[in-house]
Amino acid sequence: MFITDDDYSVLVREEIKDILLENYSETKLRAAEQMAIDQVKNYLSGKYDTGEIFSRTGDARNSHIVMITLDCALYHLYTPIPRKMPETRAQRYQDAIDWLKLVAKGEGTADLPKIKNESGETLSGIRFTSKYTAENNRW
């Protein structure tokens, strides 16, 4: 498992975790974690080897990805009870999504393993950009 119960102790106190899980089962907690992992994978999959990133365990994991995944999982746990959601939780989730969007666009960097081809060479995509906005010149 990519996320462990010990990871939660860094971001939330144990009593807050207990409040969140009041009406939840272990299955719902794991489902929220899987949703968060899939969400992060969807943003990173174009440039980074998400299979390798999320197969790591313990200290081999990237701590920033662990933090972002936890922020997303905790946000998903709070979603059914929005009145209990602290402002910091919503802000941390938005910060995580903003960073993931930057990395997905190629405007941010991450110390993560890049996608490689069968011969082990790092793949890099070609991206065309322009400082001019797109225009529709149909008459």
Model-derived features: where do they sit?
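Conserved short "hinge" loops at termini or chain/domain junctions
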Residues: 1-62, 121-139
